[in-house]
Regions:
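The conserved acidic donor/metal-binding loop of glycosyltransferases
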Residues: 90-94, 118
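A conserved acidic beta->alpha catalytic loop
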Residues: 25, 32, 40-49, 66-68, ...
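Conserved donor NDP-sugar-binding/catalytic core segment of glycosyltransferases
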Residues: 98-129
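Short aromatic/hydrophobic "clamp" motif used to bind/position activated sugar donors
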Residues: 86
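Conserved nucleotide-sugar donor-binding catalytic segment
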Residues: 79, 132, 136-214, 218
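N-proximal low-complexity "stem/linker" segments adjacent to membrane-targeting elements
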Residues: 1-27
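Acidic helix N-cap motif at the loop->helix transition within catalytic regions
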Residues: 17-20, 45-53, 94, 98
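Glycine-rich, basic loop-to-helix element that forms the pyrophosphate-binding segment
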Residues: 64-81, 102
Length: 256
């Protein structure tokens, strides 16, 4: 482990259209002590060529031998991480230039081992959607099981405090699964830095008539298969998540 180093976990799959802008947002950081760990999950587009165009020794590209999904891809990157701090950035999202500097200062100043920030949303062409996302100032274990308030692209934690995090091969909500692993440590809390330091890209998806059912099942699988909760408890948490998801949109998402 290297003191002060931030290991940035970036899974990629067919994001050649976006990944250059994402990587550039990392290069533009005012905090320069980082390593960007890109694990490509057998992309069939030009992702490799785009990544190779960046001549920066801090950028490290790895490849899965077969298409494995985001959970195992993140696990791979986490095993390669050498940093004191672990951060996450998907290959189509963007950081503001001060993201790492301000977040590390916030954590060091307050003695926090886990934090997250505010962010806004953009569309596929990087145009603002005028949606600003915040969250509770403090998230404890109880609140984390109610709903995942933490944006994956904003989260940072201390590797010294939590060690190596690995999750089960779950297809949906694998970012939530990482946080549930962190919250297994007694007394864990996540703290909000009230500053917009990231931009989340909303990409078009096909509309499904059974969207609610699929979302409910993905949460049930998260709590039952990944977090190993009994079926009844997993079903309860899945229901609670549906309710608090609506509350989160009302309370913490603002049209600007």
């Amino acid at each position: 482990m290297t003191d002060g180093l931030v290991s940035i976990i970036m899974p990629s799959w067919n994001t050649g259209r976006y990944i250059a802008e994402t990587i550039q947002s990392v290069i533009n950081q005012t905090y320069g002590n980082w390593e960007l760990l890109i694990v490509d999950d057998c992309s069939t587009d030009n992702t490799d060529l785009v990544v190779a165009s960046f001549k920066d020794s801090r950028i490290k590209l790895f490849h899965n031998k077969k298409n494995s999904g985001a959970a195992l891809t993140r696990n791979y990157a986490l095993r390669k991480a050498q940093g004191e701090w672990i951060a996450f950035l998907d290959s189509d999202d963007i950081w503001m230039p001060q993201k790492l500097e301000h977040q590390i200062d916030f954590m060091k100043k307050n003695g926090y081992s886990l934090s997250f920030t505010e962010y806004d949303k953009i569309d596929e062409e990087s145009n603002p959607l005028n949606i600003y996302v915040s969250g509770p100032e403090k998230v404890n274990r109880h609140r984390m099981y109610n709903y995942d308030y933490i944006g994956q692209l904003t989260m940072m934690y201390s590797a010294k405090e939590f060690g190596l995090i690995q999750i089960k091969d779950i297809k949906k909500n694998n970012d939530y699964a990482i946080r549930l692993q962190l919250f297994k440590k007694p007394g864990t809390c996540a703290y909000l830095l009230k500053e917009k330091l990231a931009r989340y890209r909303v990409r078009k998806v096909s509309i499904s008539h059974d969207k609610f059912r699929k979302k409910f099942k993905s949460h049930y699988d998260l709590f039952h298969l990944c977090d190993e909760k009994p079926a009844v408890i997993a079903m309860w948490y899945a229901c609670v998540n549906m309710i608090f998801g609506l509350i989160k949109k009302i309370r913490y998402e603002t049209k600007t």
